[in-house]
Amino acid sequence: MATPARRIPRVRVRGIYATALTKLVIDMGFQVVQPSRIIADRFSLPMLTLPADVTIKDSDNNPSELLIVGYEWAVNIILEKLRDTLPYSFYWRSSLPLHSTVKARVIGLRDNRCIARVGDVEAELLVDRSECIEDREVVGGVVRPGVKPRETPRIVPGARVIGDYAILIESSEPRVTISEHVRSPEKRALLAAIATSFTEQGYAVHWRSSSQHAEREELEKHLRQLREALAEARKRAEEGPPGVYSEGEAVVLVHLSSADKQKLDEIRDSVVATIPYHHTVKSLQPSLSKVIDYAEKVKALGVDSEKLVRALLELVAEDLASRRRIRILHVKPSGEYIELGKAEIKSVYVEDKSLVIVLERTVKSRGVYDGLGVEKEPGDRIVTEVRTDEWIVKHTYYAPDGTVKGTYININTPPEIAEDAIVYLDLEIDIVKKPGKKPKIVDAEELDKYHEQGIVTTKLKEKALEIARKLAG
């Protein structure tokens, strides 16, 4: 089982941010375990094989997102520090702990899914329609935690508990599964053998990757402890109201902004030669990854970093100039990705330490421009100005005769250039200006909402408000 919260968290770090994050973890006073060989050599770390309380790595679905998974007490400690160090990103946290035992009360069928409530959280309960009976109470385990606001947690019947080496599950189909990271055939055979007596008692066993480092006696003891914990969780859940009855894992996704990636660049540079935009390129422009590697080798030989960055920006500008069109992609605090559609690239150049890009779209349909409340007509032009060092993207709307219909200034984190898109975190609050009228702030309440939910940090909210007030005069 997990060790009490008084212990310093043990952290496993993987992925494209590993060097910067390992430096952060060490500076925060936490213990790095199961380091990769490169990280162990880079930081002169011992190859500790102790089980991790928290794992931090880039998400398999989006390399601009950090995935943080671990015991809730440990994740709480990590997040408190991380939100201070990387304040300009979005933080999404699971609404129910993964692999926890819960008691849910059925609400009923909705869109052919059985919906139940655990406290104030709605979740999908995986049962037959005939078992989806209003007010029925079910003891189950969380198999999908629901991380982003629009994601619904998922529960299956049967209690479950998680520990350092295994997950033990009440199951009508007892079986043994083993992490793909346990590669030794001998170890896999041993794990299967140890679990046999538990499957015979009606439990499913999943061995976690850390099990490859433990001895047989420790693993057998661990399963016995999990069995006791599961029985206790089952008993308390049956006797208590709907709620969470065993410790699970918190799951957090952090969508890193360009500003926070630059902070990670600086942290990495304190360990090994790193140029600005390292993490932006590694996460969003993998085709330029070797260019970054080469530039950093050259920097290590004494070449000025500013010259290397200038060359990198000019390379990106030349690539953009050779294209005709590019997408504009908002990342919303809700977790949605909103594409504005492809725009024609009119010009692109380097100015100081920034890329300046001018885009144009031609309107083909009728309607009303959101925020401006101005009629949209076929033939209108939308000219968009993007600077990669500014916290805004400016859209100016023109009638076919060239008359300005209005200006919409999107407040966002400094834009990044991906392989086929301009990407930024949309901060919801915006500025609109009609001809002859003063600029006006819109959608400030949306920013407040996501701040209250903990998705937007206080520092990011204050930054967005500062920009909005300055632009509104």
Curated annotation (Swiss-Prot):
Transmembrane segments: none annotated. Coiled coil: none annotated. The keyword Nuclease applies. GO terms for molecular function: mRNA 3'-UTR AU-rich region binding; RNA endonuclease activity, producing 5'-phosphomonoesters. Its EC number is 3.1.26.-. GO terms for biological process: rRNA processing. InterPro entries: DUF402, FomD-like_sf, Ntdp-like, RNA-bd_AU-1/RNase_E/G, RNA-bd_FAU-1. It is an enzyme of class 3 (hydrolase). Keywords: Endonuclease, Hydrolase, Nuclease, RNA-binding, rRNA processing. Belongs to the FAU-1 family. Probable RNase involved in rRNA stability through maturation and/or degradation of precursor rRNAs. Binds to RNA in loop regions with AU-rich sequences. PANTHER family: PTHR39159, UPF0374 PROTEIN YGAC (PTHR39159:SF1). HAMAP family: RNA_binding_AU_1. This is Probable ribonuclease FAU-1.
